[in-house]
């Protein structure tokens, strides 16, 4: 099990409160298998993996925003394609 120093991760993010929000968002992605971990899992829980990624500077609030925006765009495109497909099939 990897050891995570919360203070080092907080220093990367800026403060403990933003660290909690960022780590929770990332851990949720990992838990739902929406994204692959950027560090070896080493049988760690998603929260520990998220903190390790933050500590190494691989994830921050800005990166999380970009990932979520990209996911929303991809979802929108997929929905539009599905609507177009159904319209073609029915009409």
Swiss-Prot record:
Catalysed reactions, as listed in the record: RNA(n) + a ribonucleoside 5'-triphosphate = RNA(n+1) + diphosphate
GO CC annotations on file: DNA-directed RNA polymerase complex
Highest taxon above the source species: Bacteria
Gene Ontology terms for molecular function: DNA binding; DNA-directed RNA polymerase activity
InterPro entries: DNA-dir_RNA_pol_omega, Pol_omega/Rpo6/RPB6, RPB6/omega-like_sf
Keyword Nucleotidyltransferase: yes
KW Nucleotidyltransferase (keyword) present: yes
Pfam families for this protein: RNA_pol_Rpb6
Keywords noted in UniProt: DNA-directed RNA polymerase, Nucleotidyltransferase, Transcription, Transferase
Biological processes per GO annotation: DNA-templated transcription
Family: Belongs to the RNA polymerase subunit omega family.
HAMAP family attached to this UniProt entry: RNApol_bact_RpoZ (MF_00366)
Function, in words: Promotes RNA polymerase assembly. Latches the N- and C-terminal regions of the beta' subunit thereby facilitating its interaction with the beta and alpha subunits.
Quaternary structure annotation from Swiss-Prot or TrEMBL: The RNAP catalytic core consists of 2 alpha, 1 beta, 1 beta' and 1 omega subunit. When a sigma factor is associated with the core the holoenzyme is formed, which can initiate transcription.
Family matches, as NCBIfam families: rpoZ (TIGR00690)
Protein name: DNA-directed RNA polymerase subunit omega
Organism: Actinobacillus pleuropneumoniae serotype 5b (strain L20)
């Amino acid at each position: 099990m990897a050891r995570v120093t919360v203070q080092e991760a907080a220093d990367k993010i800026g403060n403990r409160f933003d660290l909690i929000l960022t780590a929770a968002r990332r851990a949720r992605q990992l838990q739902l298998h929406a994204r692959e971990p950027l560090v070896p899992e080493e049988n760690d829980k998603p929260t520990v993996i998220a903190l390790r990624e933050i500590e190494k500077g691989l994830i921050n609030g800005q990166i999380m925003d970009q990932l979520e925006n990209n996911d929303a765009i991809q979802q929108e495109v997929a929905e539009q394609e599905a609507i177009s497909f159904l319209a073609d099939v029915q009409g």
